[in-house]
Amino acid sequence: MKKNGKDGWNLFEQLKKNEVTVAGANQEALDPVVTGAKDMVIAGVDYMTYSAKAKGEPVDIVYPKSGTVISPRAAGIMKDSKNVEGAKEFIDYLLSDDVQKQISKAYLLPGRTDIKAENRPNVEEIPVLNIDWKTVEKEQDEIGKQFKKVFQ
């Protein structure tokens, strides 16, 4: 929003005028598209759409040429963990060939670059927005308030 300033907020205003709604959870956002009640979902999670498409639903995904946000599913070890070795073993398990292949089969992006997604674009094939996350963090309250103002 900051990079495009007023143009970004104008886009949201136009979306609101076209009866764009802010849905709740991911499936709640996708279901109206699957049933035909809505024409599209913006910013939905892609893995659910790939799954619906594989089941024969008339849906597809288009990543904007300008880029999108990829939200990794992180796993980490707390510095105060009581069982660091067990936690390391669990992380190793999550990053194992078998689990990473299962992740790929669930239409999620593998966390390792040597394991490729078989049924969706890999992370390097998806255009990604260059986001200044420190600025987003500093301005998230202001942006959230403005977003609510537009869509309420």
Predicted regions and their residues:
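Solvent-exposed, acidic/flexible segments
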Residues: 5, 22-26, 83-87, 96, ...
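Ligand-binding pocket segment of bilobal, Venus flytrap-like solute-binding proteins
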Residues: 1-64
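Substrate/cofactor-recognition hotspot
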Residues: 90
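An extracytoplasmic/periplasmic, membrane-proximal ligand-sensing/linker region
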Residues: 111-152
